[in-house]
Amino acid sequence: MQIHVYDHAQQVGQAAATLLAAQLISKPNSVLGLATGSTPIPTYHALISLYKAGVVDFSSASSFNLDEYVGLPAGHPCSYHSFMREQLFDHVNMPADHIHIPDGNAADPQTECARYDQAITAAGGIDMQVLGIGRNGHIGFNEPDDHFTCGCHVVNLTESTIQANRRFFDSEASVPRQAVSLGVGSILASRCILLLATGEDKAQAIHDTICGDITSRTPASILKTHPNVILLLDRAAAGML
């Protein structure tokens, strides 16, 4: 693991955007793995600035998002489809048919999981995967559990994750209880992984990921088995190292 610590979240975002831009410049048809949540927003805004400056071009690239809530249609304002359009895709030139996000409203979520894994394989795999990390150490929606799940799967969200996502919804009752998520095997198949963490509320998870044992109770700890992982942290998230 490479570990880089920055003064604040905006610098983390700029550093991640610089690495993603370098990937796109070296391989214009790169397959990017993208994440949602508040942590990668500065990264996406920095990428938009690089695109507007003519530094980076998305026209040949494609993307696969990590996850989507079960039961939310793509047009729902709290769906990850909506999030990605607002934070990135509406502002750059990635073709719509190159953008892939799980269908959380699919009639059969299990079939959707198999389809999504097959689509990633058909695209040649993910070149650079962006990850955030949950307070409980989850990556994607791979929650602490008694085992690691390899492929795309349906996840029952933990109470801590439901509470963390409560702020995005009108009420706690409206927060989805399940999600479709890439599994750790799908994530580890990426050729390069960028793990972003900002804020002191992520410090314990980062400590456990880096300093603790590899365990499914801290899902991000499995990243220590990958040969090309770059951690981009602000000082608050690195505070327990």
Predicted regions and their residues:
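N-terminal glycine-/serine-/threonine-rich phosphate-binding loop
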Residues: 1-32, 237
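Glycine-rich N-terminal segment of FAD-binding domains in flavoprotein oxidoreductases
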Residues: 26-52
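Glycine-rich beta-strand-to-loop/alpha-helix junction loops that act as flexible
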Residues: 34-39, 131-135, 198
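A glycine- and small-aliphatic-rich helix-loop capping segment at beta-alpha/alpha-beta transitions
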Residues: 46-57, 80-82, 144-153, 212-214
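Ligand-binding beta-strand-loop-alpha-helix segment within the catalytic cores
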Residues: 56-128
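Glycine-rich phosphate-binding loop
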Residues: 124-149
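Class I SAM-dependent methyltransferase SAM-binding "motif I" and its flanking Rossmann-like core
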Residues: 140-184
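ATP/nucleoside-binding phosphotransfer catalytic cores, i.e., glycine-rich phosphate-binding loops
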Residues: 185, 189-241
